[in-house]
């Protein structure tokens, strides 16, 4: 079975968040799954390769817009061209601050970088459009198992 839209996931949390290992895991730890999703999707002729992003991060209200952009860039260079935001929670207006929040970067007007969020979404949309309307070229193959799997 081949999905209409292959999807990966960025699970970014690490038990080593207070060490240099966290920096490596944050950028590379699960990107192998993006490559698998993208490669399979491209072999099947799919134009859209999706990824649920910012699934689990340093914690609610602890993820900067700079980190979000950096992870987004890593997704694009590993073949992802469609972003699904994790953590865009619905919270009723009458709910006390900060609202109903659980996991992920928490995309909401309650976040301090919310006034600047449109700049990132515009950037993401432009790159998504370009990559969805271009032809992927890969000069390498990834053979399992790898250290990440």
What residue ranges belong to the model's regions?
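Carbohydrate-binding surfaces of carbohydrate-active enzymes
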Residues: 1-6, 11-149
């Amino acid at each position: 079975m081949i999905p209409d839209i292959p999807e990966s996931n960025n699970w970014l949390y690490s038990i080593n968040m207070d060490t240099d290992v966290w920096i490596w895991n944050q950028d590379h730890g699960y990107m192998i799954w993006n490559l698998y999703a993208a490669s399979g999707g491209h072999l099947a002729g799919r134009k859209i390769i999706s990824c649920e992003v910012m699934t689990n991060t340093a914690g609610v209200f602890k993820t900067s817009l700079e980190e979000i952009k950096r992870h987004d860039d890593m997704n694009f260079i590993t073949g992802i061209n469609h972003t699904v935001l994790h953590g865009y929670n619905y919270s009723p207006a009458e709910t006390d601050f900060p609202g109903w929040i659980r996991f992920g970067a928490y995309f909401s007007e309650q976040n301090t970088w919310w006034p600047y969020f449109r700049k990132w979404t515009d950037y993401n949309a432009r790159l998504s459009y370009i990559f969805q309307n271009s032809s992927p070229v890969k000069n390498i193959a990834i053979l399992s198992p790898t250290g990440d799997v």
